[in-house]
């Protein structure tokens, strides 16, 4: 006789087992109509699942946060339903939910074209608008295997054989004649799956292994209502306009080519942006009293075996042979910094020792995962490592956080999510050390008034960490900064200092990154600003243009004066119409366009326009230069 407790604290007593949907109907018919699933004793379950014991129940409706993930999962099944109707010989692999949508991997005879994708989406809409009931059946492992064997679904059989214990009872979901397998929950009927859009296809290896067959991956998005779907599609359209790969090409920032996949060819304009970021970071390094060092980009495999990287990370490392020795191109800077720390005896008086590097790192990312500047093989880390005593941890972490926020605010990022990851089951170090370390990190965050999300068990085996995630103008999340405590690496590489009692002690090592990868951060900034870099970052800060040839000498003179002041100024003396030149440089997103005609020459002035097309009027060269230099030195965002 289940007693069901509802979110408002009220209880309902029932004489027999009943489904989530039955409870919703008992409360109100309208609630039953909008019931997608249930949360019973903190576990999501299907609307058709029976409740036979006492517990707390929340009816999940489209307005609840959990609903959209259930809808997306069911849309993946809907995609499978439509695929099997259009191309019956297709074998279905996996169809999980991902951020903002879902995908399904298909073993299909011919690659899907854009026309195929449109046809598939149309069929999905036709099926969804039938509002048919989705039937769930919990069956034996053998029954599930027999079902998919009869249908020739070899990938589903592989999942059963390799991932599901033969004593388990898998869930089968019936979409009319189509059958799929899933943990669930799923929608009770297809009336909840009307707001979706198929987006693209790509290749994907079965099980993510390049030795396996390449499948067709179809991506889609799905939402609870039309308003949410339209808003997301509008954000996607805006993201396309802001795509750093497109802007990088139009602004001549960088390029990639087949001979060096995932490695950036920086052009002059892009390298200027890169160097400006380095200058900013170097200023902060000086302010926070760091040493800047430079380690080798390649070291003997023996060292990486000592650190544990070879055992856990070798497949992501590039290697090379020379004189019968195997070398690894470094994927990270930390071992090199430890080796520098070990040179010369260190005393407790030398600590904290803060060591920073713009380290050139390489990681052997899968070619299919490479994506412009956002996912590369060769990148530069604004990496630092702090060696300190346990008593110094709190102060050093506090300074790391302050430095991180200082830099993020320079770029105008206001929404920053912070996560604190604590001890995992498998770890090194005593519980006492972990407790102290976790308390130190949490206390520092609280002292600075920073709200954070606790992630129990998500820390690395060698120490807890703080992660900083930036949200851009399109509300996309970019995980950039980290502050990570490390109890392991100094022990592995025999690093020590002499304490006040003349005894050896192992230092605490703090890994600290703010931008993460400079390449990736430039990609993020390019999209955040849509290529309209603030003046201090802009590759070309000022473009001077003449109206006729008569003003050429004056334009050159003004440009030279600005260049001598450190301004990145260029001239355009082409024999083109003034409107054409203004439009072109506006498209290049140059912050200031200075127009010089006879009037400006006579008055020793310049007519100033912004990259948005706004006419600021005429200024004397000196007044404009003072204003511009103030914008640059203050790193003004506007």
UniProtKB/Swiss-Prot annotation:
Name any GO cellular component annotation.
cytosol
State how the cofactor is bound: Binds 1 zinc ion per subunit.
- Residues noted as binding Zn(2+) in the record, renumbered to the chain: 334, 385, 511
Q: Which residues form the TGS domain?
A: 1-61
What biological process terms from GO does the record include? threonyl-tRNA aminoacylation
Q: Which InterPro entries match?
A: aa-tRNA-synt_IIb, aa-tRNA-synth_II, aa-tRNA-synth_II/BPL/LPL, Anticodon-bd, Anticodon-bd_dom_sf, Beta-grasp_dom_sf, TGS, TGS-like
Question: Any signal peptide, and if so, which residues?
Answer: none
Keyword annotations for this protein, in alphabetical order, are: Aminoacyl-tRNA synthetase, ATP-binding, Cytoplasm, Ligase, Metal-binding, Nucleotide-binding, Protein biosynthesis, RNA-binding, tRNA-binding, Zinc
Segments carrying the region annotation (Catalytic) are: 243-534
User: What cofactor does this protein call for?
Assistant: Zn(2+)
Q: Which reaction does it catalyse?
A: tRNA(Thr) + L-threonine + ATP = L-threonyl-tRNA(Thr) + AMP + diphosphate + H(+)
Top EC category: ligase
EC number(s) stated in the UniProt entry for this protein: 6.1.1.3
Does the keyword Protein biosynthesis belong to this entry? yes
**One MF term in the entry's GO annotations:** tRNA binding
| Quaternary structure note | Homodimer.
Q: Which family does it belong to?
A: Belongs to the class-II aminoacyl-tRNA synthetase family.
What does the record give as the function of this protein?
A: Catalyzes the attachment of threonine to tRNA(Thr) in a two-step reaction: L-threonine is first activated by ATP to form Thr-AMP and then transferred to the acceptor end of tRNA(Thr). Also edits incorrectly charged L-seryl-tRNA(Thr).
Q: What is this protein called?
A: Threonine--tRNA ligase
- Gene name of this polypeptide: thrS
């Amino acid at each position: 006789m289940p007693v069901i407790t509802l979110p408002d604290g009220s209880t309902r007593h029932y004489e027999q087992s009943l489904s989530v949907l039955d409870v919703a109907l008992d409360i109100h018919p309208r609630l039953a109509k909008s019931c997608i699933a249930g949360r019973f004793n903190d576990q999501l379950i299907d609307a058709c699942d029976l409740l036979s014991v006492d517990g707390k129940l929340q009816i999940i409706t489209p307005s609840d946060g959990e609903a959209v993930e259930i809808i997306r999962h069911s849309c993946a099944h809907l995609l499978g339903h439509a695929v099997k109707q259009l191309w019956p010989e297709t074998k279905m692999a996996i169809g999980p939910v991902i951020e903002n949508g879902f995908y399904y991997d298909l073993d299909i005879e011919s690659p899907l074209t854009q026309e195929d994708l449109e046809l598939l989406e149309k069929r999905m809409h036709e099926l969804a608008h039938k509002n048919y009931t989705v039937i769930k059946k919990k069956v034996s492992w053998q029954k599930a295997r027999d079902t998919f064997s009869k249908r020739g679904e070899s990938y589903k059989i592989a999942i059963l054989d390799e991932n599901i214990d033969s004593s388990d009872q898998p869930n089968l979901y019936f979409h009319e004649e189509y059958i799929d397998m899933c943990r669930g929950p799923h929608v009770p009927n297809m009336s909840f799956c009307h707001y979706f859009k198929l987006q693209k296809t790509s290749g994907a290896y079965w099980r993510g292994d390049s030795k396996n067959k390449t499948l067709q991956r179809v991506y889609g998005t799905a939402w609870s209502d039309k308003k949410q779907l339209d808003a997301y599609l509008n954000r996607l359209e805006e993201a396309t306009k802001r795509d750093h790969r497109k802007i990088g090409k139009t602004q001549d920032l960088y390029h990639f080519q087949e001979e060096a996949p995932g490695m950036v060819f920086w052009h002059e304009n892009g390298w200027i942006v890169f160097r400006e970021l380095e200058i900013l970071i170097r200023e902060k390094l000086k302010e926070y009293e760091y040493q800047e060092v430079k380690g080798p980009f390649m070291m003997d495999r023996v060292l990486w075996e000592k650190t544990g990287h070879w055992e856990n990370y070798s497949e992501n490392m590039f290697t090379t042979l020379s004189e019968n020795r195997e070398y690894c191109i470094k994927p990270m800077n930390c071992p090199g910094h430890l080796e520098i720390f070990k040179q010369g005896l260190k005393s407790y008086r030398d600590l904290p020792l803060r060591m920073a590097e713009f380290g050139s790192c390489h990681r052997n990312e899968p070619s299919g995962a490479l994506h412009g500047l956002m996912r590369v093989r060769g990148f530069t880390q604004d990496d630092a490592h702090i060696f300190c005593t346990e008593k110094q941890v709190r102060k050093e972490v506090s300074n790391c956080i302050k430095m991180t926020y200082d830099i993020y605010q320079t770029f105008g990022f206001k929404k920053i999510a912070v996560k604190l990851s604590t001890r995992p089951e498998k770890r090194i170090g005593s519980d006492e050390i972990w407790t102290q370390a976790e308390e130190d990190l949490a206390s520092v965050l609280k002292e600075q008034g920073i709200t954070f999300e606790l992630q129990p068990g998500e820390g690395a085996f060698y120490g807890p960490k703080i992660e900083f995630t930036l949200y851009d103008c399109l509300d996309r999340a970019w995980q950039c900064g980290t502050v990570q405590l490390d109890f392991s690496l100094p022990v592995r590489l025999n690093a020590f200092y002499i304490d006040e009692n003349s005894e050896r002690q192992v230092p605490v090592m703090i890994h600290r990154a703010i931008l993460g990868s400079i390449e990736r951060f430039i990609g993020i900034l390019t999209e955040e600003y849509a290529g309209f870099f603030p003046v201090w970052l802009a590759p070309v800060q000022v473009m001077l243009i003449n109206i006729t040839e008569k003003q050429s000498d004056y334009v050159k003179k003004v440009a030279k004066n600005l260049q001598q002041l450190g301004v990145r100024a260029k001239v355009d003396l082409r024999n083109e119409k003034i409107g054409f030149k203004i439009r072109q440089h506006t498209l290049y997103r140059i912050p200031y366009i200075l127009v010089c005609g006879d009037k400006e020459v006579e008055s020793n002035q310049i007519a100033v326009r912004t990259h948005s097309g706004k006419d600021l009027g005429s200024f004397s060269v000196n007044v404009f230069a003072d204003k511009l230099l103030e914008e640059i030195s203050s790193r003004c965002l506007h």
